[in-house]
């Protein structure tokens, strides 16, 4: 190999290595940039989930109070300790018959979680422990409460049907909504207190209310643990 040829070989070899090195560096920089973008997305996911959970704090506290109040009224009926005075003290602008014929709903904000599932961002969360706890709060514990509420709702519908079938004259007076008619409300309570069939329905209802309250406590504990983990 003459000097001129050797010179070209060295030149092109160096150029080749420069090109390869440039491509490698470019890929490295691109990978670093992508990883940084993913880290920023993960941080945003954590921050948004934390904000959503903390925004529900007041709602969860209020729901616990509502669960306990409704339970207290049904329990009072079954123990024959529900007085007309207590009936009057039921929360303003709401029917005191609600504990017996309706169900307290449970609708904490879930939009961030649902969005993460829909766009696949949930898979960006790396920690298996964190993902499992998020699923516990947003799926397992949440669905447990919802399923119990649905069962309780069926009993509430049966209680309403009881009055349709057995006390249609009072039912047609729309007693559930005419709660300002004290005489009508008291007559409904007298039926409820003295009818064993209706009380049997309330035994069913209060059993679901007890389980529901316990499920909400479990939900709250898991939720608090999730908030603590997200803040780390």
Each PLM stretch: what is its role?
Residues 13-27:
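Hydrophobic membrane-insertion alpha-helices, especially the h-region
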Residues 1-6, 10, 31-232:
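Long, hydrophobic alpha-helical segments that serve as membrane-spanning/inserting helices
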């Amino acid at each position: 190999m003459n000097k001129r040829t050797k010179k070209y070989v060295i030149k092109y070899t160096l150029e080749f290595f420069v090109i390869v090195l440039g491509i490698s560096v470019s890929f490295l920089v691109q990978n670093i940039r992508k990883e940084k973008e993913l880290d920023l997305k993960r941080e945003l996911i954590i921050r948004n989930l934390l904000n959503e959970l903390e925004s529900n704090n007041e709602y969860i506290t209020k729901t616990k109070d509502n669960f306990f109040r409704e339970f207290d009224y049904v329990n009072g009926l079954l123990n024959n300790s529900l007085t007309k005075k207590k009936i009057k003290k039921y929360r303003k602008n709401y029917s005191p018959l609600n504990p017996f014929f309706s169900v307290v709903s449970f609708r904490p904000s879930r939009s961030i979680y649902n969005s993460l599932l829909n766009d696949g961002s949930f898979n960006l969360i790396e920690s298996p422990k964190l993902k499992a706890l998020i699923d516990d709060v947003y799926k397992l514990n949440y669905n447990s409460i919802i399923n119990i509420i649905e069962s309780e709702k069926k009993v509430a519908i049966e209680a309403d049907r009881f009055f349709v079938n057995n006390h249609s004259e009072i039912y047609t007076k729309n007693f559930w909504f005419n709660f300002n008619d004290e005489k009508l409300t008291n007559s409904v309570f007298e039926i409820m207190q003295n009818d064993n069939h209706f009380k049997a329905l309330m035994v069913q209802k209060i059993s679901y209310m007890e389980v529901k309250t316990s499920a909400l406590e479990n939900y709250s504990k898991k939720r608090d643990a999730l908030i603590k983990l997200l803040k780390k």
